[in-house]
Amino acid sequence: MELIIVLGSRINGNDMHDELKGRLDVAIKLFNGNSRMLLSGGITNHDLNRSEAQFMKDYCIANGIPEASIILEEKSLDTIGNGVFCAMIVHGKYLPEVIYVVSSCYHMERSEFIFEKCFGPGYRFDFSHCFSFNRPDINEKESIELARRFFSGLLDGDIDSIKERLFNMHNLYIGQ
């Protein structure tokens, strides 16, 4: 089985923006009969009361992906959360031959770092499929440095310690 993880992105209106649709289009092209699609994104816009993953699921079904092949991760509020909660879903339940992580190209270096930290050794990742989208307002170098600090001192794949740090030290998740 191949697993395709698609990282969400904040939805500001009643519909997905072009960047998120582009990520999904890349994932849909990767999909085959041996694939499962894990759509990752929680409720980041409380005006909508729907998770990013639910919006993505609707788009995938409308574009031919069978509902039975879709897994939802609806707790994450950022990329670190994407990695943590996807790892929690996959560990012990799925044994994918390869895990494709799909996001925007500018976002892939950080995504790769975070997912390898959360999943640890024993998983084969492919980070080569991304949606080319220019976001000049995004400071990825700063975001990567914040991710490095978050994971500092934690062993790769130690999901219990990573999850504990997430809920005790990450401002988006404290107290959950």
Model regions and ranges:
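A structural signal for short, hydrophobic/glycine-enriched beta-strand patches
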Residues: 1-146, 150
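Charged phosphate-binding loop/patch that engages nucleotide di/tri-phosphates or the phosphate backbone
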Residues: 152-176
